[in-house]
Amino acid sequence: MKLGCVLMAWALYLSLGVLWVAQMLLAASFETLQCEGPVCTEESSCHTEDDLTDAREAGFQVKAYTFSEPFHLIVSYDWLILQGPAKPVFEGDLLVLRCQAWQDWPLTQVTFYRDGSALGPPGPNREFSITVVQKADSGHYHCSGIFQSPGPGIPETASVVAITVQELFPAPILRAVPSAEPQAGSPMTLSCQTKLPLQRSAARLLFSFYKDGRIVQSRGLSSEFQIPTASEDHSGSYWCEAATEDNQVWKQSPQLEIRVQGASSSAAPPTLNPAPQKSAAPGTAPEEAPGPLPPPPTPSSEDPGFSSPLGMPDPHLYHQMGLLLKHMQDVRVLLGHLLMELRELSGHRKPGTTKATAE
């Protein structure tokens, strides 16, 4: 009889214990998992074959059924936990961390940490957020707080959670097609190349182009800058910029030097240094000033010296010859003035020479 009573008592005690544990587990946390996204049937699939460029993404579609990406669900029995985002975090995202207490008991003196350093003074706020997260915000986060219930002044610290901020898109690369050294008169295209991850393939980037510190094409959806006819003026240092529509993330490409080949540039006229002329001896008659040079011969199609490879005279050559003849004529005029001055100087010195001889 006593043994039966003892067994019944133990059974009742265990039943009450199981009910209490079950009640605590149910009261601790109640999470709802919801599947969001388009509904796929055998007649219509959620993604085309072109969209499934990655083998990992292609593995989620089997026989016209599309599956969501997996995520890890962690059930914790700690008094205090730090809840982070379930999806990957990219540059420019909003990062929200929540310091969650057991059964949502009230907390005070809540402090958030990254890599062991406090991110602010203690306070009542259980959430910590970064509006525009950057790669530098990656690290190991945790929180601490003091429970106000069930007992006053019970400090607790949550386990560390690793947060990794992924790159939204790499820095763009500026490429020139067909070449960074195009021929003058030929077309050229500058392409600003970068790529978004599959998880953010629906996002849009805006592109702008710069030359020598000046903008040549404002922000737009086109990742190309067209130059229909390249000329010497298009030579210079170019770079491009890719940015999100909200301008939260933007990156520049390295500079690309463009050198247009075959552009004609007018050469500077040659500087003539005339050979020094001997002065006329006193008493000798100076030479008369030379007259103007005869005009250059008229080019003729029969003269091979004036014929270009296409049988037409070269205007650039005529221009250079005209400049040369003009400089030679100026030199002859200067020499004529010099001889006239020497003649006048010798005429002034003759009376003095005669007087000295008479004495």
UniProtKB/Swiss-Prot annotation:
Ig-like C2-type domain boundaries: 70-159, 170-257
Signal peptide location: 1-27
Superkingdom assignment: Eukaryota
Compositional bias of kind Pro residues: 289-299
InterPro entries in alphabetical order: Ig-like_dom, Ig-like_dom_sf, Ig-like_fold, Ig_Fc_receptor, Ig_sub
Pfam families: Ig_2
Disulfide bonds: 99-143, 192-240
GO biological process terms on file: cell differentiation; cell surface receptor signaling pathway; immune response
GO molecular function list: transmembrane signaling receptor activity
Gene3D superfamilies to which the protein is assigned, alphabetical: Immunoglobulins
Keywords from the UniProt entry: Cytoplasm, Differentiation, Disulfide bond, Immunoglobulin domain, Repeat, Signal
Low complexity bias (residue ranges): 279-288
Function: May be implicated in B-cell differentiation and lymphomagenesis.
Subunit structure: Monomer or homodimer; disulfide-linked.
PANTHER family: FC RECEPTOR-LIKE A (PTHR11481:SF71), IMMUNOGLOBULIN FC RECEPTOR (PTHR11481)
Protein name, entry field: Fc receptor-like A
Organism this protein belongs to: Homo sapiens (Human)
Gene that this sequence comes from: FCRLA
